[in-house]
Amino acid sequence: MHKVIMHPLILLLKIYKRLISPLLGPHCRFEPSCSEYAMVAIARFGTLRGIWLAARRLARCHPLQLGGHDPVPDNTSTQVNPRSHRCTGHHQ
């Protein structure tokens, strides 16, 4: 059932990224962008957990957030800690 929902969600995100995002300009404070993060999270963790991770990411993407590198956790992680991905200003 979740795969039936997963593929249309990823398609909608790709449409957003291709057609709408260029009109809005680069506003995401994170790398990868929030739409890319959502696609990877849904593909990696399935519909429900992927949407949850994407919603948490979107809640952190605002002008008061420093941003930086915030990858989707790997699927061996048991718990997601958004504080572990804060930008320190030092990039490799």
Curated annotation (Swiss-Prot):
Subcellular location: Cell inner membrane
Pfam families per UniProt: YidD
Keyword Coiled coil: no
Broad class of where this protein is predominantly found: membrane
Positions of the UniProt region annotated as Disordered: 65-92
InterPro entries to which the protein is assigned, alphabetical: Membr_insert_effic_factor_YidD (IPR002696)
Ranges of compositional bias, category Basic residues: 83-92
Keywords: Cell inner membrane, Cell membrane, Membrane
Stated role: Could be involved in insertion of integral membrane proteins into the membrane.
HAMAP family: UPF0161_YidD (MF_00386)
Name by which UniProt lists this protein: Putative membrane protein insertion efficiency factor
Source species of the chain: Xylella fastidiosa (strain Temecula1 / ATCC 700964)
